[in-house]
């Protein structure tokens, strides 16, 4: 049943890609500007294209190469090309948690929150201990106004990584929507419980 639900998520993502050029980008989400590829990245892209076009590959091998090329596109800010490769990869091999994680982030940026939740759910089905996916799903739930569920995810993230300033900050922002007084008290307690405050992220927490 879980594999079946992931299949329909893949279908939704692929068909969403076909219409993404017609989507309006929300004004509060900055547009990514593609970076100029370095020589090494250009060579790697050419090599990956040659392998994908000419080599006899198993589905697993092709999916892994598409994933690697998608990550390279993503690092260059080429989201449409990256998402296309990720979508092809999970059609071939729908059990790569990292691909669902990337797609979930894209879907949040596009405002497709329900599908983003499903993408992060798929990551956690494949890797139940993946706390990064729990963090990302919590942030997506925050943007969707589902604050109680978002709090559950960020509390679990905090329990496993209490020294992470961004987990503390997002937990505060979520709880601020629920009860401002409780959020302020909890933020102070978590800040004081952290050791050292050496990570630069704590400087952001200081502003709150």
Mark where each language-model region is.
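N-terminal leader/linker segments that initiate helical-solenoid repeat arrays
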Residues: 20-68, 76
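Residue-level recognition of tetratricopeptide repeat
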Residues: 71, 105, 139, 173-175
């Amino acid at each position: 049943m879980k594999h079946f639900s992931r299949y329909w998520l893949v279908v939704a993502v692929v068909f969403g890609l076909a219409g993404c050029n017609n989507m309006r980008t929300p004004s509060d989400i900055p547009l990514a500007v593609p970076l100029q590829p370095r020589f090494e990245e250009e060579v790697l892209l050419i090599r990956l294209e040659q392998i994908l076009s000419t080599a006899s590959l198993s589905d697993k091998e092709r999916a892994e190469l598409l994933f690697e090329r998608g990550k390279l596109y993503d690092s260059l800010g080429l989201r449409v090309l990256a998402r296309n490769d990720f979508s092809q990869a999970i059609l071939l091999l729908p059990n790569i948690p990292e691909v669902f994680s990337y797609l979930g982030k894209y879907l949040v940026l596009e405002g497709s929150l329900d599908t983003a939740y499903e993408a992060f759910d798929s990551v956690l089905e494949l890797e139940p201990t993946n706390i990064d996916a729990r963090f990302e799903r919590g942030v997506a739930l925050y943007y969707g106004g589902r604050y109680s569920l978002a709090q559950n995810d960020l509390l679990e993230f905090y329990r496993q990584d209490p020294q992470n300033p961004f987990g503390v900050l997002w937990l505060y922002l979520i709880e601020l929507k629920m009860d401002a007084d409780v959020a302020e008290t909890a933020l102070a307690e978590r800040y004081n419980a952290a050791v050292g405050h050496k990570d630069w992220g704590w400087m952001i927490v200081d502003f709150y």
